[in-house]
Amino acid sequence: MNKSFIIVFVGIFGFGFSQIPTGYYDGTTGLSGYSLKTKLAQIITNGAKDMGYGSGTGGLWLGYKTTDIDKYYENDGTIIDMYSENPAANTPGVSNDPYEFKWGQASAGGNQCGSYSGEGSCYNREHSIPKTYFGGINAVPMSHDIHFVVPTDGYTNSKRGDYPYGEVSTATWTSKNGTKVGPSKVPGYSGSVFEPINEFKGDFARMALYFVTRYEDNLTSFSQYQTASSPLDGSKNRGLQLWYLNLMLKWSEQDPVSQKEIDRNNASYTFQGNRNPFIDHPEWVEMIWGKSPLAVDDASFSKNLTIAPNPVKGNIINITGDQDLKQFKKVFIYNTVGQNVQTIENPFQNGNTITLKNLPKGVYILKTGELNTKFIVD
């Protein structure tokens, strides 16, 4: 991933430049697990306003003018659409995006939907948790909640339908920025899924965790709308089926909070009066749900990533690949039961040699970005 604007976590005080109101999270100290989740649900429900779905340029349409403007990639003031943004376009004012949208209605020169016949026609309102999972457009305030309803290309949104997010084995459709539709390769679910690009997987994961926290008192009632594609599990506590929870935890870990998310969280708070706590305090994800597991069967090992020596006899290994490894900000090492046993920050800043901590003899998976490989400690 290429989030050059990732902000380094600075402990319990949250992220640099995050504007968390003083006292907003009072009462959370010492809590963990579902007790913490319930306390957060109370906090982010108090003060939350229903700003409406919107007609004309009102409701969510109005919110997007402050929550989803590009100040990070091209920095050109267009709408950030996570289904079309090309993060390789890193020169301010220069776009490699397949298409771009201006905020506002067509009558005022904007690209708000409207009808569409293909990619790039217009942007609409995408429920990252599909509204069919919780009762449709008339289920309020959730269908109007800007924290998980985002502007995206209308056509790509329609290609998603109500598929859950996931990781695709073989794409049956691919958008112009690499977003995919296809059968799931995630253990526990074999249906069709919609896979966003790596740059935004953590964003969507934290939206899902926000949803099952903000609306935890409604989750059992959402069971009446359960479909084969819905990853909600009908429980107030965990909120998500295990396969989906594990995926969201993995994405949240692999794609850390960015300045874009921090700014969006602040703007959403100004707009509707509540915050996404997992952007302000990403450590709460693990404190509530635990660590992300990675089953060995989930790893299709990359031929273009190698470790030497292998088997490993000391604690120094050299990693080579056919990509520039400096683009990867973390290396994760898992054991064969899927536990994360070591995380290495900025591993390739000074070369391709990394130091393992004292790992017991056995088989391990090393993962960086979308690349992974198996190695043995002897």
What are these regions (language model features)?
Residues 17-48:
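Boundary/junction segments of secreted and surface-exposed precursor proteins
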Residues 47-175:
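Betabetaalpha-Me/HNH-type nuclease active-site subdomain
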Residues 7, 299-378:
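C-terminal outer-membrane/trafficking sorting elements
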Residues 16-20, 289-302:
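Low-complexity, Pro/Thr/Ser/Gly/Ala-rich linker/spacer regions in secreted
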Residues 113-125, 131-293:
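Domain-level detector of nuclease and nuclease-like folds
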Residues 1-21:
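Bacterial Sec-dependent N-terminal signal peptides
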Residues 83-90, 212-217, 368-369:
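Short, flexible beta-strand-to-coil junctions
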